[in-house]
Structures are given as structure tokens and as C-alpha cells.
């Protein structure tokens, strides 16, 4: 129960911190065009009142390429994702998506391009389709495209009832 309380407190803190984010002035809100080009340029970040979570991180991630980020607990892996999704702003350096500073993107526009896979797997006792949609109002076509992008469609379609198959962890 204490883990759940701690997690709830972190979520509350994260949500309330969003209002402190700085938006870069631009002629118009930048729109992500789906090129998928991400650049971390000398990025450093510290959570409030703590030592540096990451220091001077630089990398380029091109569309269709994979970047493996490994490290022990507390090494900054989740921090990199939190910064890309703008739960926080960097202390130093910049993050660019498709050549534009991520601070120029509207938060909902930015975040709709991310999918997060948690370290602990969890499946709702429901259909595969419902687990992919997870409460979002999207079409079956969009849901199937998400499965294709996650390279899951081939095994899902092997089930006789496909996306309507009851999901379960064995």
C-alpha cells in the first residue's frame, strides 16, 4: 500500500509541475510532422532538490532506428523519457524533435506521439482490442495500426477471434 501511495504522490507532483513548463515563443505552434528525428543536445537535468539525474547527454535518434538506453536503478533512463514527453524541462541543453525545440510544441500534440511501455506488464481482463485502445476513443483501423507499429499484429491475427481474443497473462 505504501508503494501505491508513493506512486500516487509522484503522479500528483508530476501533473502539478506541468504548469511550470516554459513554452518557446514561435510564430505558430509547431506541429509534429512524423519525421521522427530526435536530438538530445548536451542535456542535463536535476529533480528539485536532488543531485543531477543526467549530465551532458547527447544523442541523435533517426526514424526507424533503435536506441538502447541501459543502466542501473537511478541512472536516468526514465528521466530521458520524462524530458522527451515534457513532464519536465531541461536544466541545460536542448531537445529537438524534427528540428524544432520541443518547447515549441503544444503539450497534447507532443504527447500524442508517444507510447509508453511500463517495466511491469499489466493486461486488463478484456479483449486484445480493448487493451490496445485502453480507454481511448480510436477506430479499429487506428488500433490495428498501433498493433502493427508494435509488431504485435502477426501473433494477434493468429488467434481465431483475432483482436477480440480475451487477453490473459499465463
Task: Give, region by region, the residue ranges found by the protein language model.
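ABC-type nucleotide-binding domain
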Residues: 16, 31-170
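Pre-NBD coupling/linker segments of ABC/ABC-like ATPases
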Residues: 20-33
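Cytosolic ends of transmembrane helices, especially the final helix of ABC transmembrane type-1 domains
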Residues: 1-14
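A generic local structural motif
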Residues: 8, 24-26, 101-104
Amino acid at each position: 500500500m505504501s508503494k501505491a501511495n508513493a506512486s500516487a504522490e509522484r503522479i500528483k507532483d508530476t501533473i502539478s509541475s506541468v504548469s511550470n513548463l516554459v513554452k518557446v515563443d514561435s510564430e505558430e505552434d509547431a506541429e509534429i510532422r512524423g519525421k521522427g528525428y530526435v536530438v538530445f543536445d548536451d542535456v542535463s537535468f536535476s529533480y528539485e532538490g536532488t543531485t543531477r539525474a543526467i549530465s551532458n547527454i547527447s544523442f541523435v535518434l533517426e526514424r526507424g532506428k533503435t536506441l538502447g538506453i541501459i543502466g542501473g536503478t537511478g541512472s536516468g533512463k526514465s528521466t530521458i523519457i520524462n524530458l522527451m514527453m515534457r513532464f519536465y524541462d531541461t536544466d541545460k541543453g536542448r531537445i529537438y524533435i524534427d528540428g524544432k525545440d520541443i518547447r515549441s510544441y503544444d503539450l497534447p500534440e507532443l504527447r500524442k506521439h508517444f507510447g509508453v511501455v511500463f517495466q511491469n506488464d499489466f493486461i486488463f481482463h478484456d479483449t486484445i482490442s480493448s487493451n490496445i485502445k485502453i480507454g481511448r476513443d480510436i477506430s479499429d483501423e487506428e488500433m490495428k495500426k498501433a498493433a502493427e507499429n508494435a509488431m504485435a499484429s502477426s501473433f494477434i491475427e493468429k488467434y481465431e477471434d483475432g483482436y477480440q481474443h480475451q487477453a490473459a497473462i499465463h
